[in-house]
Amino acid sequence: MKRNMKWIRTKLPIIIPIILVIALAVVCVNLWQHKTIEENDLMVMCKSSVNAAMEHFENYQSNGNEVEYISGVAEFRAYMTTYLCLTDEPSDADYTWCNILYGYMTMKPEEVKANISDLIDALEYLAEDYDHPNGFNLINALNNKIAAE
């Protein structure tokens, strides 16, 4: 019995920290993988929202169907939401430019519709890469163009 107690007193302080370190490493790896998977899912959602918005706006451009325009605006808003989740920076200038454009889409739809080809050009860049700087520059230029009208 004394021998077992001696073993417990000498080996247990070494074994417990090793087990805790292994458990902590497993938890950290699991959390890292979950974050990576979640980020990949958000990127897919972001890209699919931009592609859907672009498709709706192209359909609106070709047939003038108001439902296509409204669907494009909704998909653009979905893109903005996923973009914000990916960047975690609500004060990001790119997000602000998108937010201004979204405001124009809802409050001044006729001005946006008159410049729908410029909007589609911007979305083509964002369809390639959800944070492509040229896409945001074209969105900013479109905002300035609409503001000047």
PLM features: what roles do these ranges have?
Residues E110-E149:
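C-terminal amphipathic alpha-helix
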Residues I22-V44:
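Transmembrane signal-anchor/signal-peptide helices with a preference for the extracytoplasmic
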Residues L24-L31, L101, L119-A127:
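Generic hydrophobic, helix-prone segments enriched in Leu/Val/Ile
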